[in-house]
Amino acid sequence: MAKHIVELTDALSNKIAAGEVVERPASVVKELVENAIDAGSTVIDILVEEAGLNKITIIDNGSGIEEEDVATAFLRHATSKIKNEADLFRVHTLGFRGEALPSIASVSHLEMETSTGEAKGTTISLEGGKIIEQKSGHARKGTQIEVSQLFFNTPARLKYLKSLPTELGNITDILNRLALAHPDISFRFSHNGKPLLQTNGNGDLRQVIAAIYGVSIAKKSVPVKAESLDFKISGYAVLPEVNRSNRNYISTIINGRFIKNFALVKAIQEGYHTLLPIGRFPIIVLQIEMDPIIVDVNVHPAKLEVRLSKEKELGQLISQMIKETFHKLQLIPDGEISKKQKEDQKSEQIQISFEEKKPVKETPTLFSKPTIPEYVPSDEDAPREDDFILETMPSYEPESQAEQEEHTKERIPKMYPIGQMHATYIFAQNENGLYIIDQHAAQERIKYEFYREKIGEVSRELQELLVPIVLEFPADEYVRLEEQKAKLEEVGVFLENFGQNSFIIRAHPTWFPKDQEEEMLREIIDEALSAPSISIHKLREDTAIMMSCKKSIKANHYLTTQDMEALLDTLREASDPFTCPHGRPVIIQYSTYELEKMFKRVM
């Protein structure tokens, strides 16, 4: 009788593994570049043709592979990075599973030339995972891997690939993240001979941000850092005035590995809370160092997802760090920000031509087969003008306690109202220039901070009602409110059972608007019903935002000069006067110099 359960061949096993490890050309680039990083490379060249479908070449100046280990490197689960089970819980390298090379080789034509620099090198060629030839090669230290005809033996995989621009975008995104994670390595990336990314490898993260996102973004970035017993965080956060429509510009790096973690992204967004408009996201790069024992990278073959044993503590540290950083800064955007923001948004969509295949001028580092040249400085290594611009950017040093207290008192300067536009915007001036204030957003911020404080101490300030309020609900809502009573009490709503499907309310906070008590109670109860699992903190926050929005002066509301003066003076006392609770700007400024430049009084 024939056996029904059989052991799969190595070739078939490698193809199955390739399905998890090698999803698209970007996966090949990621795995090979990570190998180059683990090899201690200081310069890595990435040459791609036709978005990687035609050819991918990775060249490094790392440690290389010994001749006797070259063939072994293409066996499944063969690796030099871990030796035993204990090592699996203290992974210090980007790769460790021993799956990348055999998986890539099984679905492509692959040629590798490598040398440790101490003896002759080795060249090996594989097709579909089978070794075709192995011979002596050049002795220059480093490794060059060329992958061509990707997915030649798995045509079904080709059907699921996206357009060439999309696949190239995936490769670019991977390399951007790796460059941000390793500013001490020089990355050179070209497509069809056209350079797309170059970093100088001098260890300056801000220079890498400039190379990837542009100098204008780097100028708007401020250093962030925090430390606890378990974590050390550093990086750059871009000012809230510059933001994006998606989360792609949030980069979290743990021990040199770019990772995706929803909880950490949520913590970052919490740090920017009320500083960004709804639906907008920050630009931020965080490098996090921790003991490998508290991070599990062995979750998925792609190694993008990780498990953290102290995830909540790390999230709280990140949120607090971002809040404290921006609380020390004056966040009044200049009058040009709207124009810059639109230009930045246009630059998010980069169109890449696939017709032009003429190579740019050859440099000593982007070399052709079969020689691995020395990595000598070229003109492209020389400092760029952008580098000098970045050197002049202001640094943000930690302030003393006295300076912080003074800064908190004077977050925005004294302004003198000179008029109102469309009964919506207040125009004000001082010696620094012209200010335009959104009157609704300004009062919304003031009232939000008032309600946020009051909601936290509702039990101390209650007003007994002469005529209690009775509220009736459908049966399903009544049952759900029974479960939410404790939460509602935290925001000033005290429900007592009063007959079938009814509650009676005998008191409310004194800060409820007069003659609008029942309306406010209904609003808060609806908020709790719409999100049954809402936390007390979030319910308080949402209640404060809702009340501040409804009770603030609206657009098309004329104000007297005295009203405007009072509003601006009260705004100066707010802890975060620059945005409304929804993240919209409260105030923008045109400096005297900018105005004089507009009118050509200065050149």
UniProtKB/Swiss-Prot annotation:
Region ranges (Disordered): 361-383
* Any matching Pfam family: HATPase_c_3
KW DNA damage (keyword) present: yes
Highest taxon listed in the record's lineage: Bacteria
Presence of the UniProt keyword DNA repair in the record = yes
Question: What's in the keyword line of the UniProt record?
Answer: DNA damage, DNA repair
GO term, biological process aspect, one: mismatch repair
Note the coiled coil stretches, chain numbering.
Answer: none
Picking any one GO molecular function of the record gives: ATP binding
Report the Gene3D superfamilies cross-referenced here: 3.30.230.10, Histidine kinase-like ATPase, C-terminal domain, MutL, C-terminal domain, dimerisation subdomain, MutL, C-terminal domain, regulatory subdomain
Q: Name one GO cellular component term.
A: mismatch repair complex
> According to its UniProt entry, what is the function of this protein?
This protein is involved in the repair of mismatches in DNA. It is required for dam-dependent methyl-directed DNA mismatch repair. May act as a 'molecular matchmaker', a protein that promotes the formation of a stable complex between two or more DNA-binding proteins in an ATP-dependent manner without itself being part of a final effector complex.
Task: Give the family from UniProt.
Answer: Belongs to the DNA mismatch repair MutL/HexB family.
Recorded hits in PANTHER family, A to Z, give: DNA MISMATCH REPAIR PROTEIN MLH, PMS, MUTL, DNA MISMATCH REPAIR PROTEIN MLH1
This chain belongs to the protein called DNA mismatch repair protein MutL
The lineage is:
Bacteria, Bacillati, Bacillota, Bacilli, Bacillales
